[in-house]
Amino acid sequence: MPKPHDNDHMPFPVLVGDIGGTNARFWILMDAHAAPKEFANIHTADFPTIDQAIQDCILDKSGFQPRSAILAVAGPIKDDEIPLTNCPWVIRPKAMIADLGFDDVLVVNDFEAQALAAASLGRNDREPIGPLTETSLNSRVILGPGTGLGVGGLLYTHHTWFPVPGEGGHVDIGPRSDRDWQIFPHIERIEGRISGEQILCGRGILHLYNAICAADGIEPVWTDPADVTQHALKGNDPVCVETMTLFVTYLGRIAGDMALVFMARGGVFLSGGISQKIIPLLKSPVFRAAFEDKAPHTEMMKTIPTFVAIHPQAALSGLAAYARTPSSYGVKHEGRRWQR
């Protein structure tokens, strides 16, 4: 009978998976030193279950039989059946062990995987935002504006990295400047409040764009966040430019808040496709100015480096780092790991 298990080591080969709402991504690690065997992204809508997707696209095509699986998922991990956010798949670790031949299955939060990546990304996998280019062995934070706003902490103590998942994307965000006070009344509230995720995600770009249009009494032109971003980068639509300037400002504010919470002297990392697409905007003075504007701690904030994670598979990289050297990380297993 599969059961929760507390031993750190997971036997190789190990399948690592990053399961999102639209795509699932997988690598197989044959041992602790070999380069990962990579596979094409799987569209979750193409398969009724994750088990069938793994069987058809990974096991049958590769000819490998992993002994372990480490899966990062967007959704609460509460019991033996783990429903995913924005995807009809359900993770059933016991069934995976019985039907797919695994001996060991560990399921973690998606931003735990991103936090693990923040501990292991090399210089070529991160783009500095601002004048500071080096990290240090200190606590870190990773934020990812995407479908929502993910936030993860990474504490460093006793020579070990401890990922700290949470719901930091749902902290309050409010107006500070005169322009903010004009715009914020037009942003949709959830039960009377505006959280970071209402603005700092894909749909949040559109919320912000529409609020600016409403504040200025003009008709919106664009209905796709990608269009707003594209025209801001080109600089050919002033409303789009203001939208993304404010997006970067608010992202800097929240990133600075999270840096203070975790005392993230080791760096703050921005992950995901949106962050990668808007690197030119993030490199403007706006982001760092908002990030550092945390009186009475402005001088300290100037010493904290900020980066965009540009590794194409950052979450898988983080999971792989953990699989190879589990003793370097303090990853909770209780209630999240099952063994044959």
Curated annotation (Swiss-Prot):
Localization in the cell: Cytoplasm
GO cellular component: cytosol
Chemical reaction(s) catalysed: D-glucose + ATP = D-glucose 6-phosphate + ADP + H(+)
Superkingdom, taxonomy of origin: Bacteria
Binding site for ATP: G17, D18, I19, G20, G21, T22
Keywords associated with the record: ATP-binding, Cytoplasm, Glycolysis, Kinase, Nucleotide-binding, Transferase
Pfam families reported in the protein's UniProt record: Glucokinase
Name recorded for this polypeptide: Glucokinase
